């Protein structure tokens, strides 16, 4: 089978490898689509290292090709599925306490890490989520990032009729926006890119703000009777977004640092302010199985529309260009189409 393999930093190549052999309790899935996420980009550039060579890809969809003889879930060959490819061990402290997104072994080489850039993959039945014919394989490939947004919103304990500010309107910001609207929030979106603000408006944002040209704090305070927003999610890695969040949050407000910062900036607040205001600062990383289940349903129900976020489709023959396109600020998501050659 074909697979796009990252062999070293800034080097990805198409290799012919043996398809995986499934165990009696596993499924063989033919991959249809896989998103090129920030994780794949960081593996490609060497910013993040798991091991080399590695078949990346964790935002995937496909069709069941073979079912192991001991599988008891009733799933059949031909079933269309969304795939949960960042697997958990199910045995460590975090898995056993409901925080499988913190699994100590999720990037253990023995766990068949990732793999969505291959034509086929062997998975456990718990890793597949059936999808109806009403959604495409391309849409189903967004289940994983939508699940991460659901986890993020749970971390700030977003309530009905609260005000939420999303800092950054890239693909994750747009998916956060739609998931938050499902929860009954009034959503503000801040981003200096006019095209991204326009997309957020089309997807239902109450108000979009250009933080480079407008007074973010003044606008937020105006629309919240001087309080500030109840919650803020930072999806942009820009330091100015992190700094601004603490100026627009209300007393008892919650901030989720969703994005990662490899330069590890200090949080721009102090212990006494947190003490006096009861503000909560948290982060979120990945998602759990339940988050993934909910994400699939939101896409199927049409509550989260990911189609506008598909910026380009790439193939094995164009994988290098696809990687470069995925890293451009002009794109939302680039998908690898594994059936297109």
Where are these regions (language model features)?
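N-terminal glycine-rich cofactor-binding segment
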Residues: 4-21, 36-66, 82-83, 100-114
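Glycine-rich beta-strand-centered segment in the early N-terminal region that forms part
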Residues: 20-34, 47-93, 127, 132-135
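Residue-level marker of beta-strand positions
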Residues: 59, 79-80, 94, 120, ...
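NAD(P)H dinucleotide-binding glycine-rich loop of Rossmann-like/cofactor-binding domains
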Residues: 89-167
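Mid-domain Rossmann-like dinucleotide-binding core that forms the NAD(H)/NADP(H) cofactor-binding site
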Residues: 135-213, 218
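Glycine-rich cofactor phosphate-binding loops and adjacent beta1-alpha1 units
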Residues: 156, 203-280, 320
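Residues in the short beta-alpha loop(s) of Rossmann-like NAD(P)-binding domains
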Residues: 193, 261, 287
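C-terminal hydrophobic helical "lid"/dimerization subdomain
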Residues: 243-247, 289-341
């Amino acid at each position: 089978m074909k697979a796009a393999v990252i062999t070293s930093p800034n080097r990805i190549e198409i290799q012919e490898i043996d398809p995986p052999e499934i165990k009696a309790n596993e499924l063989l899935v033919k991959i249809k689509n896989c998103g090129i996420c920030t994780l794949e980009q960081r593996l490609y550039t060497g910013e993040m290292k798991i091991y080399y060579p590695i078949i990346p890809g964790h935002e995937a969809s496909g069709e069941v090709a073979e079912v192991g003889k001991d599988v008891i879930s009733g799933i059949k060959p031909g079933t269309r599925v969304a795939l949960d490819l960042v697997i958990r061990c199910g045995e460590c402290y975090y898995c056993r306490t409901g925080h499988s997104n913190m699994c100590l072994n999720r990037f253990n080489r023995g766990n068949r890490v990732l793999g969505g850039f291959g034509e086929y993959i062997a998975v456990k039945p718990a890793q597949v989520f059936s999808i109806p014919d009403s959604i495409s394989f391309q849409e189903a490939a967004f289940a994983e990032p939508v699940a991460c947004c659901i986890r993020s919103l749970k971390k700030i304990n977003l309530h009905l009729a609260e005000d939420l500010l999303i800092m950054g309107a890239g693909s994750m910001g747009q998916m956060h926006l739609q998931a938050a609207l499902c929860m009954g929030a009034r959503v503000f979106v801040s981003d200096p890119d006019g095209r991204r603000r326009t997309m957020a408006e089309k997807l239902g944002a109450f108000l979009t703000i250009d933080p480079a040209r407008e007074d973010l704090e003044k606008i937020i305070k105006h629309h919240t009777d001087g309080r500030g927003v109840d919650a803020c999610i930072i999806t942009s890695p820009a330091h100015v977004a992190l700094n601004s969040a603490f100026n627009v949050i209300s007393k008892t407000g919650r901030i989720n640092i969703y994005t990662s910062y490899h330069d590890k900036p200090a949080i721009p607040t102090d212990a006494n302010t947190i003490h006096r205001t009861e503000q909560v600062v948290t982060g979120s990383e990945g998602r759990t199985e339940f988050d993934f289940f909910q994400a699939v349903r939101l896409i199927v129900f049409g509550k989260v529309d990911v189609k506008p976020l598909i910026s380009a489709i790439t193939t094995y023959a164009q994988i290098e260009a696809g990687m470069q396109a995925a890293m451009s600020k002009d794109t939302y998501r680039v998908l690898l189409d594994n059936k297109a050659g």
